[in-house]
C-alpha cells in the first residue's frame, strides 16, 4: 500500500476529531454567553 495513503488515512480522523471538538466547544461557549439565540431564531 502507498505510504502517503496510509498517512492520509491516519491523519483525517485526528483532524476530524479536533475540528468537531473545536466546533462543539465554540457552540457551547456561544450558548453560555448568549443563551437565548437558539430559542429566538424559531
UniProtKB/Swiss-Prot annotation:
Keyword line: Chloroplast, Membrane, Photosynthesis, Photosystem I, Plastid, Thylakoid, Transmembrane, Transmembrane helix
Subcellular location: Plastid, Chloroplast thylakoid membrane
InterPro entries from the UniProt entry: PSI_PsaJ, PSI_PsaJ_sf
Record-annotated membrane-spanning stretches: 8-28
Topology of this chain in the membrane: Single-pass membrane protein
Entry's Gene Ontology cellular component terms: chloroplast thylakoid membrane; photosystem I
Entry keyword annotation includes Membrane: yes
BP GO annotations: photosynthesis
Top-level taxonomic group: Eukaryota
Similarity comment: Belongs to the PsaJ family.
HAMAP family: PSI_PsaJ
Protein name: Photosystem I reaction center subunit IX
Species the sequence originates in: Gracilaria tenuistipitata var. liui
Upper classification of the organism: Eukaryota, Rhodophyta, Florideophyceae, Rhodymeniophycidae, Gracilariales
Amino acid at each position: 500500500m502507498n505510504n502517503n495513503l496510509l498517512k492520509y488515512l491516519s491523519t483525517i480522523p485526528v483532524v476530524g476529531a479536533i475540528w468537531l471538538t473545536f466546533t462543539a466547544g465554540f457552540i457551547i461557549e456561544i450558548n453560555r454567553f448568549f443563551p437565548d439565540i437558539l430559542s429566538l431564531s424559531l
